[in-house]
């Protein structure tokens, strides 16, 4: 966590491969020949004097990784004794300003801020909690929890004991709270980084345990479908602690043993936000691109657009698996994600989101 970005140069490798060991496909990759100072100078020129070169800003910030954007911010501060965020805010407006500010903040802080607002005031936006906690692994969860303390400080909180966990406990209860805590406490099974790096050569079989998967399948059946009543804690301990690869294997074995999918079992034996969370964790392991495609569709469904959800999902997935999500979206909805976003957004905000998805704009457009 000593890197310039809270998640380091890349997200945890546990997100990098599908259940069969195939690399997920990002739309944003590290920039060849990257120079933070050169980008900082170009950004400064694009905002200097009358008028703003919005396309130049987009083509830099929306094509860089989060790690690169943090380096650009530091170079900008060093060169011009001014925060890049302040200059962007003074030169832009509306949703375009919002998405630029989301792009240049480090990822843990962006997610922590989303969680803060999800639990602020009356009611809780459980959709945000589920979308974020489902997609973080142990080291990332710790980084977000640390960033949450900084968000509280920035918002003027003087309660030294207040934290992500204390706020979450106030806003949730019962089995749902227990499951969230299982994720937030960052004690899920982990895989050594060298084993993750070896997946392309050795395959997923090198990091999964068939005996454990069979035992978990039996335990899950015994906790619900195979008894009167449901043991939610036993279900939670398996679903919220295993790696995605281990959960995928367990779901395969469960179907072979009982002729019913594990997902069907969870949906029939649980309810409410607790069910939504477990289903999301399981689907993240089984068919992640389709799950996140549905989240993106929901962010644009109905009257108005949930812009912060749309921004968060596109920004955070762009370096991991956004190309696979785009393919899943078109398969599910018969329309490209790119066109769906274009239909729901406008102007430079639209262009920024489209560049995150791989669209190319030249200076004449």
Swiss-Prot record:
User: At which positions is Ca(2+) 1 bound?
Assistant: 47, 49, 51, 91
Entry's Gene Ontology BP terms:
female gamete generation; membrane fusion
Q: Which Gene3D superfamilies match?
A: Annexin (1.10.220.10)
Its domain of life reads: Eukaryota
Where does the chain bind Ca(2+) 2? 52, 54
Residues reported to bind Ca(2+) 6: 300, 302-303, 344
Transmembrane recorded as keyword: no
Q: Does the keyword Repressor apply?
A: no
The terms under GO molecular function for this entry are:
calcium ion binding; calcium-dependent phospholipid binding; identical protein binding; phosphatidylserine binding; protein homodimerization activity
Keyword entries, A-Z: Annexin, Calcium, Calcium/phospholipid-binding, Disulfide bond, Metal-binding, Repeat, Secreted
Listed under GO cellular component are:
cytoplasm; extracellular exosome; host cell; membrane; nucleus; plasma membrane; vesicle membrane
Detail which positions bind Ca(2+) 7: 304, 344
Which Pfam families does the UniProt entry name for this protein?
Answer: Annexin
Q: Which residues bind Ca(2+) 4?
A: 126, 273
Amino-acid positions noted as binding Ca(2+) 3 in the UniProt annotation, renumbered to this chain: 119, 121, 123, 171
Chain positions of Annexin repeats: 34-105, 106-185, 211-283, 287-358
Coarse class of the primary localization is other
Residues the record lists as binding Ca(2+) 5? 169, 172, 177
Subunit structure comment from the entry: Homodimer.
Domain comment?
A: A pair of annexin repeats may form one binding site for calcium and phospholipid.
Name the protein family.
Answer: Belongs to the annexin family.
What is the role of the protein in this entry? Involved in reproduction of the worm. Involved in host-parasite interaction. Delivered into the host cell by means of parasite exosomes. Binds to acidic phospholipid membranes in a calcium-dependent manner in vitro. Causes aggregation of liposomes in the presence of calcium, but not in its absence. Likely to promote membrane fusion. May provide structural integrity within the tegument.
User: What is the official name of this protein in its record?
Assistant: Annexin B22
State the organism of origin: Schistosoma mansoni
